[in-house]
C-alpha cells in the first residue's frame, strides 16, 4: 500500500475500512489536517487491491481499522522484515519511490504533490489546478503504476 498510494505511515495505519472506496480503488484518509500537509485522496493499484482483499479475507474480527497494528509494532515488524530480507527499504523510501515513479510516468508535480497530501495553499494554484478526486483518479489510472514489476526489474 505504501508504494502505490504515497500515504504517510500514520495515514496508512489510521485507515478504517470505511475509508476505502473499492469501486474506485480510492482512499479518503480522515486523520490528518495539518497546516502544510493535508490528506486529500489516495489511490491504490490492482496489485495492492488483490493483496488487501486477501489480507481482509483472513480477518474474522469486527475491528473497523483496516490494519490492526500499532505504530510501535509496525516499526518492529518493518525492521525485522528489512533485516531478514537484507533490503534497506523504509516506508519513507517507498513514499519517495512513489513520487519519483509518478514523475517518471509523466505526472505533473502539482498532481504528485496532491497524491502525497501536499495540497497547495495559494489561491492561484487552487484556482487553476483541478484537484477534484475524479481528475486525480483519471491521472492515477493513466499511469498504471506497477510496484512489483518495477522492483523486480531494478
Regions found by a protein language model. Name each.
Residues 19, 101, 119, 131-135:
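The DNA-recognition helices of helix-turn-helix-type DNA-binding domains
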Residues 5, 10, 14-54:
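Conserved tyrosine-mediated DNA breakage-rejoining catalytic core shared by Y-recombinases
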Residues 1-10, 100-104:
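Short pre-functional
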Residues 2, 13, 113:
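The alpha-helix within a helix-turn-helix
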Residues 20-22, 88, 107-127, 150-153:
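Short, polar N-cap/turn motifs at the start of nucleic acid-interacting alpha helices
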Residues 45-88, 92, 98:
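Active-site/catalytic core of tyrosine-dependent DNA strand-transfer enzymes
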Residues 17, 83, 104, 117:
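Residue-level detection of the helix-turn-helix DNA-binding "recognition helix"
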Residues 135-154:
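C-terminal secondary-structure termini that scaffold catalytic or DNA-interacting sites
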Amino acid at each position: 500500500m505504501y508504494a502505490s498510494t504515497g500515504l504517510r505511515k500514520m495515514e496508512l495505519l489510521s485507515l478504517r475500512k470505511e475509508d476505502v472506496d473499492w469501486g474506485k480503488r480510492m482512499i479518503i484518509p480522515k486523520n490528518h489536517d495539518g497546516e502544510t500537509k493535508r490528506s486529500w485522496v489516495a489511490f491504490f493499484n490492482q496489485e495492492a487491491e488483490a493483496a488487501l482483499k486477501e489480507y481482509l479475507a483472513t480477518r474474522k474480527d469486527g475491528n473497523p481499522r483496516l490494519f490492526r497494528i500499532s505504530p510501535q509494532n509496525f516499526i518492529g515488524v518493518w525492521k525485522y522484515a528489512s533485516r531478514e530480507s537484507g533490503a534497506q527499504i523504509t516506508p519513507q523510501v517507498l513514499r519517495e519511490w512513489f513520487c519519483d515513479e509518478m514523475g517518471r510516468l509523466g505526472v505533473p508535480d502539482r498532481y504528485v504533490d496532491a497524491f502525497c497530501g501536499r495540497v497547495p495553499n495559494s489561491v492561484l494554484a487552487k484556482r487553476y489546478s483541478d484537484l477534484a478526486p475524479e481528475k486525480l483518479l483519471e491521472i492515477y489510472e493513466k499511469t498504471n503504476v506497477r510496484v512489483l514489476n518495477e522492483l523486480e526489474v531494478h
